[in-house]
Every structure is written in C-alpha cells, then in structure tokens.
Amino acid sequence: MQGQAKRDYPGSFLHQATWYREHAALEAKLSRLGLLISQGMPVCRTLVLHPVESLWYQIHPGWVNGLNAAEPAMKRLERQFRQLFHWLMQTQTDFDYGDEGILATHAAVDAAQPAALRVGQMRYRRVVICGCTCIRASTLQLLRSFSAAGGELVWIGTPPRYIAGEAFSECASLAAAGIRLPLRKSDVLRYFRAQPQSVRIMDDNAAAEIYLQMRQTDDCIFAFLWNKSMSRTLHDVPVRIPDGLYAELWDCRDGAVYALPVRNDCVSVSLAPGAVRTVRLCREQRALPPLPIPPQTEPVFLRSPAGFRLNEPNVLPLDRAALWLDEELLCAQDEILKLDRTLRGRLGMEQRSGEMLQPWARKGPDTSYPIRLCFSVLCEQLPQTPLLLALEDLPAQTLTVNGMAISLCKAAGFWVDSCFSLYALPAACWKLGENQIEWTAAYSEVCGLEAAYLLGDVGVWFRSGTPVIGCLPQTLKIGNLVYQGLPFYSGKVRYLFDVPADQKFWLQLDAFGGSCTAAACGGERTVFWGSDPIPLHSDAARTLELELILNRRNTFGPLHRFPRKQPYIAPDSFTCDDASRYCLYPTGLLCAPKVYFEESICFGGIQR
C-alpha cells in the first residue's frame, strides 16, 4: 500500500482488507453458484442483434467525453441498449447478444420445424433487432433466410436504414413481414410476457424485480432467480413450473439442499434484496428436509447493545499540513497530496500518477532535499494512554509533538500494511486545544508525501466540521458510527446484545454500513451478507455477538470527494478543490437487528 499503491484500483484482496478472512465464505458461495450455472445448456431461445457496428459507423473525433457518449445519436443508442436489456430481463426472457462478425462466420438457418438460427451449439427461435441503424449485407441475408424458414423476427423501434454504410430500404420491407413493436416499455413488456415460458413469475409486480436464467441438464432444470432490487424484499413470490416436476432449493451459501412444496404447479420463493435463489426442477422426488423458514411472529428489535469491542485502535487521518523546503515555507496549510504536487513542481520532478515509472525501475543518483511537515491536531479530552503515529515512505529524521522530542525507535505492533512505521507518542505530550506534530525528513524523487494516521483508544468527534480528539464512547447506539466517535475507523466492530438463554431464533439485518457481518451466540460463527434471516441458537452465556466487518474507505479515502457515490474511483479522485469538508460513508448497524423467536418467551418485559 505504499504511496500510490493505496490509490490503485481495484483494491487489495489481501490482508490489508478488513474482510479478507471472511472472503472465503463469499468465494465458496459464488463458486457453488458458478458451478451450477455452468451445468448443461442454457434455456435461451432469443438472440438480440448487438448494435455495436452501428456505433462504429458513427465514430468521429469528439464523439465521446471520457466514458460517456457526447453526440445525441450516440446517447440515444446507449439509452436504447440499456432499456432493451432491462425490459427483456423484467419479462424473464433470457437472451444472448449476437455479434454480426460472429454471425457471418458461424450462424446458419436450420429449417427443420420449429425453425432455428443455429450458432455453435445454441439454437435461437427469435431474433430481436433494436437500436441498429446500420447492418451488414450478410446479416440481412441471414435474417431473410431465417424469416422465410418460419423464424420469428421482432423489430423494435426504427429498422436499420443503412447496409454497409449505404442507404437501403430492404430492412423496412423485411420488418413489415415480421413483428413490429414501438420502442415503448409497455408494448415490449406486454409482448414478451405473453410468450410461452416453462418457468414464469406469476406476480407481475415482483416479476419487474426478478431476473431469471435457466440451465437444462439430462435429468433436471436449474432455475436461477435474482432479486435485482437492493432495498425491497420479495415475500412468497409464486413461480409456476412445468407440470409433473418436483422442486428443490439449493442453498449456495452452505451447500444445503431442501425440498420446496409444489402447489397447483407453483412454488413459493422469497428473495431478500440482492439475493439469488437456485431452484432445481426434476421428475424424481427425493427425501429432503423442508426449507427452514423464520416463524411468522412479530420480531423483537435489538435497539440497545450491551457493549462493543474493536479489533483495531481508532484512527484519525492527518491529511492537511504545512510544508517547508529547506526552511522556506512553501504552503501554510493544504491537503497532503496537493503539497506533494507543489513540492515536485518546485523541484522539477515528475508528478506521481498512474503512468509514473515504478521507483525500482529508476536509474541514476537520487538527490534528496530537506523538508519539514507540520500537522495540527485539536484535542478536547486528553488521552489517558500513549497514542501511535503511523508514518510511511519518508523515514523521519526528527519528530516532535508540541516541541517535545519523540523517540524514533519504532514501536512494536502492526497496522494494516507493512509500509507504515509506528511511533509511540506519550500521553504527557498532549495538551487541550491545538497540538502541533512536526517531523523532518529527506525528500527525493522516489518518495512521496502521504497522510499520517493517529491511532489509539480515543474518540474522534466533528466540531464545526473539524475532527477533534475526545473520549472513546463507552457504548454504541444503533446508527451511523461516523457520529459516534468512530468516523474514520475501518476495522471490525463487535456489538454485544443480551438474549434469552437456550433459545432458537432467527436474526435479520435490514441495513448496515460495511462489507459483511458475522454472528455467533456461543456456537459457530456465521458470516452473511444482505438481509436474509439466519438461524441461531443461544447458549447459557445469553450473549449475541454481532460483528460488523467494515472496509477501508473512510480511512484511506477519498475523504473529501463529493458526491459520495462516484462512477469510478481513480488516483485523481483523491484530490479535490475543497479538502476541508469530509464525505464519509455511513458505517455500523444503521437499523436495529430483528430477532424472530421460535418459542413464546418473555424478553425485555414483553411476552413474545
């Protein structure tokens, strides 16, 4: 993570990530899903002609602005492309995109009824043309042959007007013999929902949120249902299946398999936000346990944690400083990465960027220059224990806090990455109000100015938008940790809740800020994502440990980039015009956990 590496993308999947130990649970789940979704052959009968060649015909200087189209015609093509994808998926119509180059080489019409367009091992009975302004002559001939054999052509919107870049009207006459639909959501949904499907979502309201894919093997069909909504839980969605088949639910989280009851050729499936359900349809009924479901009782809300634990010290990033070059003040106060650019510009050095030459590839002598950095830290409560200062890249020559010399012997311990050196700052060196941390170092082209990090058993509180050192909170409330003394903390937070002893119950989280969660109640620790309820069993200890695994965003940034959600994060995202305002992600338990007890009990003075 040294220097620019902490702003590289994608980020590290190694021990620097708070969630790296929990990542195995996610990989196991996705590996099971990946294995199942590769079985047999796709149940896919629709081919959508990809309009990429219509885009290439319109390419010219200035057609694009960064990653976005700049021309109205290009924007319209991109919009239509997105719209058609979502409309088809909302009707549970699985499809493949057809590239005209691949079709010219590998596609052929199979006239045996029902007619099919054969591409490799796939056989398509329907071809959809939407958004194409120009197609190849070979594509037009293929579509004409497919239509003549009885294949279904669906033309959405305006048919192509150009063939190989020249104006032709043949597409319009071919479209007149096919199915014409306006480029309107209601018409597209109505048509495709009316088409026969072996598996169908019977609730149109829920169907708009569910994407479906199926795989056919020799003895079964696997149906994969994904709730694309990240905020809406879909309860008891009726799914119609072929007559005479039995249903099984395969849980990719732990590999368990359960029987799903079939009533009137329908199964009932519930989907938490973002959840995937894998349903196996087969002709032989197996002896399987029933799917465990939470009891249909009123939930108990856990609103008051009995305590909490942190697995790392709290942290305050120091990313604004004053800079001196050989006793000349270059800048009285600025963001640290801007100071680095200022210093490199003054010294005639190449700026650090994603295209910079790696330090170990440089040749020749490396001249160094004496610099001094000063960070200001506000303190409203004096620390009771020593703090640690994490520095990187620049070996300190001298280090002082409020004029008190600090030993340059590195303190024992480790924090996040080996690039950080830790220095102990005695509690006696701090004072109420403003504190000054200064260090001198030798700067060279292979170095870089980076933020420092203050670590310890202290709280960090915002006063008029400025972070101030105070007391670490004694308890945590349900809500955003940013406003509870832990705004920049990025380790793990373990919430402790009192629960009745020796009880079976289900735990559900509707909203949290972090990467994932883990729960234990005296037994095995369960890692989970999303808001799917999980079963637990309390022991005699009567304590539910709910651990929230955060990510490093609020520690390493970008800390000042507005708005919070960006289309992408790159090295340039870490500098901005106003580094005095912080833009942090909400972390912690953002709403009270819900518990569903399987037996009637008295909990918190209330009969459940």
Residue map of PLM features:
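Carbohydrate-binding surfaces of carbohydrate-active enzymes
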Residues: 1-451, 457-491, 498-502, 595-596, ...
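C-terminal structured "cap/appendage" subdomains that terminate the fold
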Residues: 130, 138-142, 155, 415-426, ...
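Glycine-centered small-residue hotspots that permit tight backbone geometry or close packing
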Residues: 151, 491, 509, 515-516
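Active-site-adjacent substrate/metal-binding segments within catalytic domains
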Residues: 372-374, 494-498, 505-507, 514, ...
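Solvent-exposed strand-to-loop "edge" motifs in beta-rich extracellular domains
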Residues: 392-396, 510-512, 549
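Short, small-residue-rich loop/turn micro-motifs
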Residues: 403, 509-511, 522
